[in-house]
């Protein structure tokens, strides 16, 4: 019995010694207090529905992120190079990361998705154990054509990767979209319908997903993980207007989007 009490005493004493060290281990979010540039369209633009109560404001409130917002209502992927130039003009390299939330307007405008690469047959020097010599092989290079979504993304990412090679760049897929009517000349059907060039909205989402692999950047799939599905009446609580605008989010929708990003960003470094 005495031996047992002695062991318990020793273990208790050891626990007390280790407790201060354990208590000092505090998790710090990798994006805490960082400076982030936001590129995109109306879902990010403070001049659009929900104003400053956007997802990036949730990140500011919860993580202390300083937002540099360059998104403009109605813009498509071909505007990203301009937004990048504006960032460089105003902040140079004095920021930590870039977040791009774009693609829904490319779908609405009927911009074809296109392909990532053009292929050609060329001569290239190679050797695999034998004397080096010229070989005939197929080569592919990124499409740099602003008339397709893939081409636009290639142009934008090539520019950003060239301008800011040491910065973290995170792509956000578009979220689901439903009916929106902004006047007789601007009526946007839901994602249940193909666009004017005969492509589904999900094809544009998939292109942003693939862009992560093409350009070696992380992608947060908000289409899948945001939990917001505007085609259902039950999700009207997250939308700007249940009758006329099921495209844009209200502050509650952005709060949910921002909360999702807080946790998704835990898995990514902001700086290197």
Regions found by a protein language model. Name each.
Residues 1-10:
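Bacterial N-terminal signal peptides that target proteins for export
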Residues 12, 40, 102:
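Residues that line or immediately flank small-molecule/substrate-binding pockets and catalytic motifs
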Residues 9-20:
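Bacterial N-terminal signal peptides
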Residues 22-73, 78-93, 98, 233-234:
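Serine-esterase "nucleophile elbow" of acetyl-processing enzymes
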Residues 62, 84-272:
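Alpha-helical cap/lid subdomain in secreted, periplasmic
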Residues 7, 22-34, 139-152:
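Solvent-exposed, charged interface segments at domain starts and junctions
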């Amino acid at each position: 019995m005495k031996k047992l009490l002695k062991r318990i005493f020793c273990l208790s004493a050891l626990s007390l010694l280790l407790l201060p060290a354990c208590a000092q281990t505090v998790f710090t979010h990798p994006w805490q207090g960082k400076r982030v540039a936001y590129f995109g369209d109306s879902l990010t633009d403070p001049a659009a529905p929900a104003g400053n109560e956007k997802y990036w404001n949730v990140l500011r409130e919860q993580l202390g992120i300083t937002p540099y917002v360059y998104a403009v209502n109605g813009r498509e992927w071909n505007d990203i190079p301009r937004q990048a130039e504006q960032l460089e003009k105003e902040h140079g390299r004095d920021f930590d990361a870039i977040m791009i939330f774009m693609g829904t307007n490319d779908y609405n405008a009927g911009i074809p998705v296109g392909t990532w690469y053009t292929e050609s047959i060329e001569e290239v020097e190679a050797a695999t154990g034998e004397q080096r010599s010229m070989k005939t092989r197929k080569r592919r290079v990124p499409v740099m054509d602003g008339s397709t979504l893939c081409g636009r993304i290639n142009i934008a990412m090539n520019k950003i990767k060239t301008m800011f090679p040491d910065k973290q760049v995170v792509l956000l897929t578009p979220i689901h979209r439903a009916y929106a009517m902004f006047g007789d000349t601007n009526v946007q059907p839901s994602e249940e319908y193909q666009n004017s060039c005969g492509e589904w909205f999900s094809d544009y989402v998939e292109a942003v997903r693939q862009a992560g692999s093409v350009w070696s950047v992380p992608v947060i799939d908000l289409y899948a993980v945001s939990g917001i599905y505007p085609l259902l009446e039950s999700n009207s609580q997250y939308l700007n207007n249940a009758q006329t605008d099921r495209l844009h989010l209200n502050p509650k929708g952005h709060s949910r989007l921002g909360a999702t990003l807080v946790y998704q960003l835990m898995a990514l470094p902001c700086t290197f």
